[in-house]
């Protein structure tokens, strides 16, 4: 009740001020249009004397503007105290337009009184313009009172609520990767840092093609880790993008290493720029389980659908058969012919020759028993199916160039050996990714076993476009490599790729055990998963209720997504969201980030302008400086075939001459 009385009293005061304002405007017209007023017979003697006294004592009419200014002042005060019915569509543009028109008509009409026309004409025009101007000023003032003071549509994308303070301090150590950033907070762009102080807790880099994950993140990982003396294994899907960076950066930053690192390349497309390496070298296979692991890796890389069918009869059979062949080559003549090409060639010999040879060795007899039972039992269709499921996928890998690279060893795969640190780049080709990816998967599995040991150098495993190869043991490497100083960085487009190619269970293990994550633009389930990972934060919500008499504003808080899926789906190139992990001794209060990773493009261009191509390793020149690459590769291919023919011939002769074994040969 008291509030209503106060409002009524305020309304009366505002009406009084507006009335005085109108009287002042009328006084202005009466004084400056006096001749017209006298002609119309509306002059009043008492009013004349009052106005003359005002002018004599206060100089009210010394200028035509004085009464107008006082009138405008009182009009303004009356409008400020008026509570109008709020209108959502009312805008400042509309108000300023009306006020500008009113100001011009009200104040800039003095020249009308000087026009060489009759007093009647002058007064009529002056009164009309002044009245119209006053009405416009009154409308503008009243509209201002109806304007909503809080425009809830200023921030339609909720940028202010979803911006947050991020890490601004550089935290660097001997292992860290540090990326400068720009982030938006409190209507300003701030400078900050993404501090990956513990890269050994593994890193995932996500993003659709063109989101900048290689340029902004992966390239920086390679450069900074080389500067800090990491040995390195790089899977370069689009060879030689990453390899060229690694080679040139290593050549320019060798002072980070106690022992000068060696640079090695495996490239099936260009043997001139490729070293040779046997991934099943006998020195690194001490047990038949190592042979099984190699067979398992190669088969699942050739048949990605088998990943989710592990344990099935027609999945295990070819793996067992190929594992037996690899282990046979390991024990035959102390591993002299233990190479991947020799294993493929031996598999493609007649099974009537291969089975007796393999079963003549006691350690392989049980491995081959299912095949021997089918053969001796006459189940030829079953046997043919088992053998074909091994031969058909592996036959895709019969290539002279691939045989050349994989049939000899110019270096070993223990890249983090303190005495011989290495930077190894293996190159794939998008046009041949299924074939090359299978062979490179073999290198992956072997390297994982060799580097994940104590007492070695700190090392980095960088896999670009992870789904293009099956990386056996990846989940175990992430889970256990931290104590052995192995930093893993995985780049791919989204989680659905990983689920498709690695299976739901293994993909979930990889996703949930990684400590550092960067994500450019991703959509769908991946964006939802990331949003849930980043959690919720307390956000302010404001609502306005409008009625005829008043506007009520309510402000409340609620928990909402810190970075919603819609934000992640709409990230521009170079913008990343993610989180990092910290250490006991290096605490990071704000682990989550939503920022643009700042890359000095001018510096990058200067560096790239001085890059040298990866050098030729083998020029394949004969004594007369003729190019003999094709012939050398073909000779190697034919030599492997001859080696296998000789092995089969010698072994069958041995079995035939041994009374205890000759029963294995079926006539």
Label each region the model flagged.
Residues 1-211, 215, 220, 546-548, ...:
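Basic- and hydrophobic-enriched, low-structure N-terminal and domain-boundary segments
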Residues 25, 42, 149-153, 194-486, ...:
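P-loop NTPase motor domains
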Residues 52-56, 166-172, 438, 465-468, ...:
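A short glycine-/small-residue-rich loop at the edge of a beta-strand within enzyme catalytic domains
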Residues 75-78, 82-83, 441, 445, ...:
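Hydrophobic alpha-helical segments involved in membrane association or supramolecular assembly
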Residues 169-189, 368-381, 516, 522-523:
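N-terminal short leaders/motifs
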Residues 183-189, 303-313, 541-558:
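Low-complexity, polar-biased intrinsically disordered regions enriched in Pro/Ser/Thr/Gly
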Residues 478-480, 484-487, 491-581:
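Conserved ATP-driven motor cores of ASCE-family P-loop NTPases powering translocation/secretion/packaging/pilus
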Residues 592-595:
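N-terminal charged/capping segments associated with class I S-adenosyl-L-methionine
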